[in-house]
């Protein structure tokens, strides 16, 4: 049930947590959304995902569906209404920071520490949906990746908004035992943060002979997969990809391609828990 409207924004009875970004793609929105949902489930809070439907984002949609209840619509307000009808307590919106029709209870602006703000310019001159100085309008920023340069990124952030809450996260492989350290690997992905994927594998002591980067949400063809298999065969390599990419290639039923699964570990998770519950 809608409670009220304020300045053309709709406020819902259900608690709304928006996990969005400024940088186009690869900022860990889906990973953070899943992490928040898992935290709420452990606390016995009935939570769900909300996502606006985009035809080219079936990979993210399937991953969210594998991790909880997903309400999806061409309009986020309609999806939120459906969640309220089913008596959910919390709605986690994967993307939607620039949707000014909803009055969110909590908003996170997500960044990847490698991509950061790119050239610092907004679309079409750069990768940003909003000017970086708009951080002054938000209360929470989430930075994820290997965090090697995190002190400088914190300083840049606090110069813009000295009161913003900075949350940090690192990716950790969860199925490393399925991979041999004495093998060589060809890795490929079509995600927004390919460099973070590469960095995580290198830090896991797996040897990469070749990495291939495709565009974000890339729609693989049989020809693409055959070329990857041929390349790996010529290099005498095993093949690794991401969970998101696997959602887009599993119809090819190619058993030689292995998936490296990863989870997001929140640094100071108690701080996040106290915020969202």
Name these PLM-found stretches.
Residues 2-56:
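Walker A (P-loop) phosphate-binding motif
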Residues 16-18, 92, 108-110, 142, ...:
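Structural motif
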Residues 48-49, 108-111, 135-145, 158-173, ...:
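Conserved beta-strand/loop subsegment of P-loop NTPase cores
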Residues 55-161:
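Phosphate/Mg2+-binding loops and adjacent switch elements
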Residues 95-98, 146-147, 172-174, 242-248:
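Short, polar loop motifs at secondary-structure junctions
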Residues 178-222:
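Redox- and metal-dependent alpha/beta enzyme cores, enriched for Fe-S-associated oxidoreductases
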Residues 215-218, 256-277:
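Short, flexible loop segments at boundaries between secondary-structure elements
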Residues 219-237, 244-246:
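A short, acidic, amphipathic alpha-helical segment used as a generic capping/interface helix at domain edges
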């Amino acid at each position: 049930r809608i409670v009220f409207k304020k300045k053309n924004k709709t406020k819902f009875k259900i608690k709304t947590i928006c996990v969005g970004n400024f940088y186009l793609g690869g900022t860990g929105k889906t990973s953070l959304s899943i992490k928040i949902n898992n935290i709420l489930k452990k606390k016995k809070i009935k939570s769900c995902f909300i996502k606006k439907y985009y035809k080219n984002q079936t990979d993210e949609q399937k991953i969210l569906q594998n991790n909880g209840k997903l309400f999806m619509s061409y309009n986020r307000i309609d999806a939120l209404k459906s969640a309220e009808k089913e008596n959910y307590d919390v709605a986690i919106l994967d993307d939607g920071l620039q949707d000014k029709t909803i009055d969110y209870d909590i908003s996170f602006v997500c960044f990847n520490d490698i991509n950061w703000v790119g050239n610092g310019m907004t679309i079409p001159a750069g990768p940003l949906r909003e000017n970086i100085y708009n951080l002054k309008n938000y209360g929470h920023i989430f930075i994820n990746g290997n965090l090697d340069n995190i002190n400088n990124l914190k300083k840049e952030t606090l110069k813009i908004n000295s009161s913003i809450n900075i949350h940090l996260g690192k990716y950790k492989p969860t199925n490393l035992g399925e991979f041999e350290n004495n093998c060589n690997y060809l890795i490929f992905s079509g995600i927004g943060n390919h460099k973070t994927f590469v960095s995580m594998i290198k830090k896991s002591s797996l040897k990469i002979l070749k990495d291939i980067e495709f565009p974000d949400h890339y729609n693989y063809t049989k020809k693409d997969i055959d070329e990857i298999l041929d390349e790996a065969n010529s290099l005498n390599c095993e093949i690794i990809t991401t969970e998101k990419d696997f959602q887009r290639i599993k119809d090819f039923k190619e058993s030689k391609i292995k998936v490296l699964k990863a989870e997001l570990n929140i640094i100071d998770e108690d701080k996040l828990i106290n915020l969202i519950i």
